Regions:
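Non-catalytic structural scaffold of enzyme domains
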Residues: 1-148
């Protein structure tokens, strides 16, 4: 179930439920592989836990900052991930003069789930979303959603 359009409270509730379940399996660590759940729930659930819980945003942000040659990075993701501003915050902590352009792409998730990868509608939607990034001269793009 995509979390991108869920409220912060809902995402936190789901994350806590999943972690409780995983704890019954005696896991040694947990990776929150959803960008939106990492953005909205990671800090809280990690603070509540006695086992390591990590997300995907820090690693993705760090890699993008290391990869960019011109300091201009684009991030696409769900409305939740982009709206949280987490990638911009983390990247600017790593390199304060970095320029980050975020673009929510809410229709990418259902298009991927329906397998509409080579469809004219998909091409139109992708062109519309990504047009915001054109002219920004980004040289690095973060795909900030596990769906794409």
């Amino acid at each position: 179930m995509p979390y991108g359009n869920k409220s912060k409270d809902t995402i936190l509730r789901y994350s806590r439920q999943i972690i409780r379940f995983l704890r019954t399996r005696e896991v040694k660590a947990i990776v929150i592989a959803c960008n939106t759940a990492s953005a909205y729930a990671l800090d809280t659930v990690a603070a509540e836990s006695d086992i390591p819980i990590i997300g995907v945003i820090n690693a993705g942000a760090r890699t993008a900052v290391q990869a960019t040659r011109n300091g201009k990075i684009g991030v696409i993701g769900t409305e939740g991930t982009i709206g949280s501003g987490i990638y911009t915050r983390v990247m600017k902590q790593l390199k304060p003069d970095i320029q980050v352009t975020g673009k929510p792409c809410p229709l990418f998730v259902p298009l991927v789930e329906e397998g509409l990868l080579h469809d004219s509608v998909t091409d139109e939607i992708a062109s519309l979303y990504l047009s915001v990034l054109k002219g920004k001269y980004i040289d690095t793009l973060v795909l900030g959603c596990t769906h794409y």
